[in-house]
Regions:
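Membrane-interface helix-loop-helix modules in multi-pass inner-membrane proteins
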Residues: 55-127, 146, 222-233
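Juxtamembrane membrane-water interface segments of multi-pass membrane proteins
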Residues: 30-54, 72-80, 104-115, 177-196, ...
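Short, membrane-exposed interhelical loops at transmembrane-helix boundaries
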Residues: 285-304
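Central hydrophobic cores of alpha-helical transmembrane segments
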Residues: 262-270
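Helix-coil boundary and interhelical linker segments in multi-pass alpha-helical membrane proteins
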Residues: 1-13, 71-86, 140-160
């Protein structure tokens, strides 16, 4: 008996994993930027930024791995998606640059200019999060492909559905940021994070519901994947799990737990991501290009897999160590800047 591994599927999983880790790890510090206007006091803002200062730089590593892996392992998908998403991708990069520069320069300025960097930090976070969500919606609604090339227009990405997914991701990141503050802060700042988390949770549940209802109407493939027999046996556990996690998250907020709200919010993101995977598989460009059609030669994928097999455990190990070293509450007057 022979045993074979589908290298294209392995690479699809690696890229999906890298993107998910980026979303949850960079999501909460983008969420902190989104929430920044709600915390006008300098002392609170210092605590907020110090809570992520030791780890935020490494979060973009996963975005580079996901984007680089897509270009190397699935060059056809990369060649189609990037022209289709030029505007939101460029907007995302501009937002990340503004946020990164503001994060560092805020600590090196006088009071008169600090507010400008605070605005840049919040604005960059909003722009990056919104652009990521819009790009996701644009991919889900489908990309016009003819002869292995993008054949759509410059503004095809901008639709009511993509705006909906963009705002939904902003809300989700904000909830991640609020529950991160619950985990990492104390006193009045923590209490305000609790109350903010309640509003954001209900907003996120509404967003999940609206996106989930709208998605099957984008393409008949999505409806068949979720609602036809016997697929429904495999897809039903996802909304059931969302309901269970929601109840647990509500209870954890009501009981004012420290860690549970953050990790249960991560679980909501994981379930939403699983739903996205169910909808898209086996397409990497929905309804146009499958992962096997987009794959680079198997020899190239195997060559790259050797390097990635050692790189990912190294990044995971370093990331885990960094979070472990800098665990615990962040208090006013303490920090890394």
């Amino acid at each position: 008996m022979t045993f074979s591994i589908d290298i294209a599927t392995v690479w699809a999983f690696i890229i999906a994993f890298a993107v998910f880790v980026y979303v949850v790890m960079d999501g909460f510090d983008l969420g902190l930027g989104i929430l920044f206007p709600l915390f006008p006091a300098k002392a609170d803002r210092d605590v907020i930024m110090n809570s992520v200062a030791p780890v935020w730089d490494g979060n973009e590593t996963w975005l580079v791995l996901g984007g680089g892996g897509l270009m190397a392992a699935f060059p056809l998908a990369y060649a189609v998606l990037i022209p289709a998403l030029y505007t939101p991708v460029i907007a995302m990069l501009i937002g990340l640059i503004f946020r990164g520069v503001a994060f560092e320069f805020r600590w090196r300025t006088t009071r008169s200019t600090r507010n400008r960097w605070d605005i840049a930090f919040a604005g960059g976070s909003w722009l990056a999060a919104l652009a990521q969500g819009i790009a996701l919606g644009a991919i889900l609604q489908g990309v016009h492909v003819e002869g292995r090339h993008y054949a759509g227009g410059w503004w095809d990405w901008l639709t009511p559905f993509s705006i909906l997914t963009g705002l939904s991701l902003v809300i989700g990141y904000a909830l991640l940021g609020a529950t991160w503050l619950v985990l990492k802060t104390e006193g009045e700042l923590r209490e305000k994070a609790y109350s903010t988390s309640w509003y954001l949770l209900f907003a996120m549940l509404a967003a999940i519901g609206v996106v989930s209802i709208a998605t099957p109407f984008l393409d008949i493939h999505y409806a068949h994947r979720w609602f036809t027999w016997p697929n429904v046996i495999l897809t039903t556990p996802v909304p059931v799990a969302v309901a269970v996690v929601t109840v647990l998250l509500l209870r954890s907020l009501a009981d004012k737990k420290d860690a549970q709200p953050f990790f249960l919010t991560l679980a909501l993101f994981a379930l939403s991501y699983a739903g996205l995977g169910i909808s898209m598989y086996p397409y990497i460009v929905p309804q146009s290009i499958t992962i096997w059609q987009a794959a680079s030669p198997e020899s190239s994928q195997i060559f790259m897999l050797v390097g990635v097999a050692g790189l990912i455990p190294l990044i995971l190990g370093y990331t885990g160590w960094a979070y472990w070293v800098f665990r615990g509450k962040m208090r006013p007057g303490s920090g890394y800047h």
